[in-house]
Amino acid sequence: MSLTDTPNANRLHIALFGRRNSGKSSLINALTGQDTALVSDTPGTTTDPVAKAMEIHGIGPCLFIDTPGFDDEGELGRMRIERTWKAVEKTDMAILFCGGDTSAELSKETKEPDFTEELYWLEQLKAKGIPTILLINKTDIRKDSQALAIKVRESFGDTPVLISAKEKTGIEQIRRTILEKLPPDFGQQSITGTLVAENDLVLLVMPQDIQAPKGRLILPQVQTIRELLDKKCLIATCTTDKLPETLHALAHPPKLIITDSQVFKTVYEQKPEESKLTSFSVLFAGYKGDIHYYVKSAAAIEMLTESSRVLIAEACTHAPLSEDIGRVKLPRLLRKRIGEKLQIDIVGGTDFPQDLTPYSLVIHCGACMFNRKYVLSRIELARKQNIPMTNYGVAIAFLNGILDRIEY
């Protein structure tokens, strides 16, 4: 991804689900106009989810996800289906193929279309609030496309889109249907919310330490600056050591100061009384997750003991650095508060345990590399198991005793 590309985390995630050899990969290629996904008559060609970014007129940046067939078999097949389930957690919108190969969906007893698996997956997608487009592919070789469409409508209660991915017919209808079923709240989230308005002065305090990539800013900083520019705010920036000089140079105190969570305490002690304070991580807690649940869950820190177990989850999978906030600084703060024997497990990327019951608390990063749907799915998992879940910025503010004075 270049600096001018929309991050995948901010794209509408559209996942394709269906049986093996149903034409999911062919549709990806037809939609993107490229041979993105491997296509073969052999069932099970797609062994891992394949993602392709593209723009759709009227919608904007999208990420299409081609998943392994949910009717896969054997031990390897079971593992592939698990990958497909993981893709569901990131899905904003689904395209469900009704049937696989032209004969595979027929019941052995009745010789009628058997949509048992498709109906099960539709039920699971609906339970997660994922808008789903029903689709019948291979109309170029099916003699019963219209009859099958009637059966789908009767079984699913919705009208399918008929296409031939191979001949590229019906592709425009798919694009129109995506636009029609677009989640109404998608893309409506704001990083800074109602904290600032046009002409407000905002000061960004950004430490350029070993974690900061040389020659560029980290993604949350870039996205926040872009939003502030769109809001027509006045923006000033500085490093932590130049905060006093910067405040002195400003004609009046900033309306809002946004800092890195790891220097919360330092900035709080130096900020003007009338300036509001928050951090990039706290802002992203609301932008990507559920800030109110995070703030409520932070109180669980007070209940931790040395026999407790805490899970720290990072979206990135970078090699740990000497002063890494998630792997070094945050554990140091926790153990200083709770005790050196506090057990802390750390996971990165898509590694996230489905069973959270061994943990007294989950602390997540700002998740700038994940889409909102994926973060909310993790929060929902924690909620269902009654496990408190907060994020880096909220936890650090709590540990510094200033959470009630932080804006979000």
Per-region residue spans from a language model:
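C-terminal end of P-loop GTPase domains and the immediately downstream helical coupling element
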Residues: 164-251, 312-313
